[in-house]
């Protein structure tokens, strides 16, 4: 994902989103990275994206950018990137759940806890929600 995000958002208003330096096919080859290296790649790519998005004015959303030679309005390109990233994050979560099995900690409301959660006022307060999830994840495998 980091290669895609970095490529798409580096100079994304002035150059094609598919950069020659990306070497996309190499991203699908097995690689051994430390956790620190992986996080560095991840954070670096997202920093590029956030820098570019932060610089956008509302009226720029209707401007056009190019991705693989195809023109997209900026708002369309952002939604396209969001959908693409969500797809891959889903894959990552699915694999992580399979690897961690019983040690998986739910990222939201654990399975079987919806009714209890709905009865609490914690859902109205972000800090209370986080505390509720943390307390439930201590003894729950979740989903």
Language-model features and meaning:
Residues 1-2, 92:
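Generic short alpha-helical hydrophobic face used as a protein-protein interaction/packing hotspot
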Residues 2-52, 59-65, 98-143:
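Short, helix-capping/interhelical loops that line the mouth of catalytic, cofactor-
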Residues 67-74:
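Active-site-proximal inter-transmembrane loops
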Residues 74-112:
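A contiguous, mid-protein "functional segment" used to position or interact
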